[in-house]
Amino acid sequence: ISYACATLYMLLLLGRFLRRDFDALCDSPVRFIIEIGVSYGLYYLSNLVVVGILVALNRLDNPNNGAVIDMALNNRRQIFIMTVFMAPLVEELMFRAGIFGLLRRYNRPVAYAVSMLLFSVYHIWGYAMGNPSNWIYIIQYLPVSFLLCRCYERCNSIWGSIGLHMLVNAVSMWAIKPRGLALSCPGVAGSVA
């Protein structure tokens, strides 16, 4: 219910911004599709590297992903709506349009670094506060956060990063199997990535 409230709040607060940025998507839909596709390919490759690191460390049990998998197994439709539609909208408006967009005016590398770090911490902090060894899972969210910033910047519209975020989460949700097994999906829940 918190994501439903946050989605409604963002739509009411930033509806004009979303509408204005939608024009850029309508002007160049092919560019958006290509950028999202290239970004997803880069996400997939970076995910292979991150999973390799986590396998080497024997740390494949990301508690955020585990929580989303458990919720999805109990209520797939609602969790799908939350992770594929609500979370990308809310999180992209916060981390890309808000933090990244504001800081980019002053210092582009700092904008990338701060947005990436805050997005990554957002997804794992609750679990890491209870068990500090869970901070390692931040590495699963850093690459996708970089790519979401890149997609936002290259598309010159928040809809580019929203589209990429939706794709990452949709594929991650698809990977959740009824038996509770999941493919490597660091972006599941809360997004993503």
Predicted region positions:
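Short, structured coil/loop segments at alpha-helix boundaries
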Residues: I1-S2, L11-L14, L54, N62, ...
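Selective recognition of hydrophobic, aromatic-rich stretches within alpha-helical transmembrane segments
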Residues: I1-L8, I139, P143
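Hydrophobic alpha-helical transmembrane segments of polytopic
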Residues: S2, S39-Y40, S115
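Hydrophobic cores of alpha-helical transmembrane segments in multi-pass inner/ER membrane proteins
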Residues: Y3-L13, T83-A87
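Transmembrane helix-loop-helix hairpins at the membrane interface
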Residues: L48, A56, N74-A193
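Juxtamembrane helix-loop-helix connectors linking adjacent transmembrane helices
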Residues: L18-A87, A182-G190
